[in-house]
Design a protein with these regions (language model features):
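Non-catalytic accessory segments flanking enzymatic or RNA/DNA-binding domains
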Residues: 1-110
Length: 110
């Protein structure tokens, strides 16, 4: 009781060209729908999904990633992180996944 059920979905990284070096790391069950949600909140439509990976327990994985990256957080509530480059973000997301999961998930990479 009280345990959150596992849910598969996508861990994604979103950028906004107005804020270089800032990236949002979140989860969704539908990548295209998630991007549309962001675009409606921006008159310039300048959000871009930079990276995503499927995960069998995306909410737990996201929580672990956020915990490991908390020193880069700009505001934990909205999941934005200030980090040097997109590749650094992707590397940290990949590193935070357990090795056995990463082997299986490499098949789902963009």
């Amino acid at each position: 009781m009280g345990e959150k059920r596992q849910k598969s979905g996508y861990i994604y990284v979103i950028s906004n060209s107005n804020f270089p070096s800032y990236y949002k790391i979140g989860v969704t069950e539908d990548i295209k729908s998630r991007l549309r949600t962001y675009q409606t909140s921006s008159p310039l439509r300048n959000y871009k999904i930079e990276y995503y990976i499927h995960h069998p327990d995306c909410y737990s994985a996201e929580k672990d990633i956020h915990e490991q990256m908390k020193h880069f957080a700009t505001n934990i509530k909205n999941e934005w992180f200030e980090i040097g480059s997109l590749q650094m973000v992707i590397d940290r997301v990949d590193e935070s996944l357990q090795p056995k999961e990463k082997i299986l998930l490499d098949l789902y990479k963009k």
